[in-house]
């Protein structure tokens, strides 16, 4: 079978068709069931985090190590030539691409990952987040988790809560779920942080049902997935942050009318938007969701480097 993702840049979730998403998710399930510690033996992968991260960087680097590859890179831009000496992103990527087989990259500027593809030659770029734009590997682990908990990716009722304006995870996840059939969206956010118009327009063009709401309680009984997000302090001015940070908080009591199959997800880090008491309910699944990032990222790395987890390595 031809691997359509071999040496492909993964910048946006829109770079992947439904069939390609399903291929990656199948591989992720295979890797979760049966680890392959030598699948990427002798490969070297750069972990280039021009913007600091905890979970995404550690998840990627764990995925790399558990596939037998080596990882080089940096956790932030402060001590790089780009940060200290004014080197351009183009030059940085041009040089790093001569050292490695793939580049995992996070950057604070929207479009930076796409720009990097112009200078990496045949070395694939995997976007680990570019500003408020896209976070495709978070979306892959979200899809994997939804499929794991619901047994499907079609006909899902999902609510997204909190910062829907700047939250790149909800943009990517909405676009991904729109590739599947019969999904229904509920968007719950303050007006200042509403889902961007271009996402709503995309849903309208596809004939996908969505609605806007002012409270979580209104929609709980309808949901399969409740996707919480934090208000991103780093992307708001202090006065705006203070006004909206406490508007949408999930408590255990809000889940009394929930379906038995409901799972609460969150891309993390959590601040105050999910009360600690929710952790002890059967609905909480955000820590397992984070753990699934290793398998989703392993599957994507294997695909872009031309390896099939379902077949033994030579």
From Swiss-Prot:
Tell me the superkingdom of the source.
Bacteria
Could you say which protein family the record assigns here?
Belongs to the aspartate/ornithine carbamoyltransferase superfamily. ATCase family.
User: Could you tell me which species this protein originates from?
Assistant: Sodalis glossinidius (strain morsitans)
Q: Which Pfam families match?
A: OTCace, OTCace_N
Gene that encodes the chain: pyrB
Q: Which NCBIfam families match?
A: asp_carb_tr (TIGR00670), PRK00856.1 (NF002032)
What GO CC terms are in its UniProt record?
Answer: cytosol
Example GO molecular function: aspartate carbamoyltransferase activity
Please report the name of this protein according to its UniProt entry. Aspartate carbamoyltransferase catalytic subunit
Known function:
Catalyzes the condensation of carbamoyl phosphate and aspartate to form carbamoyl aspartate and inorganic phosphate, the committed step in the de novo pyrimidine nucleotide biosynthesis pathway.
GO terms for biological process?
'de novo' pyrimidine nucleobase biosynthetic process; 'de novo' UMP biosynthetic process; amino acid metabolic process
> Which InterPro entries does the protein's record reference?
Asp/Orn_carbamoyltranf_P-bd, Asp/Orn_carbamoylTrfase, Asp/Orn_carbamoylTrfase_sf, Asp_carbamoyltransf, Asp_carbamoyltransf_Asp/Orn-bd
Binding annotation for L-aspartate: 85, 168, 230
The alphabetical list of record keywords is: Pyrimidine biosynthesis, Transferase
Residues the record lists as binding carbamoyl phosphate: 55-56, 106, 135, 138, 268-269
Q: Mind telling me which Gene3D superfamilies this protein's record contains?
A: Aspartate/ornithine carbamoyltransferase (3.40.50.1370)
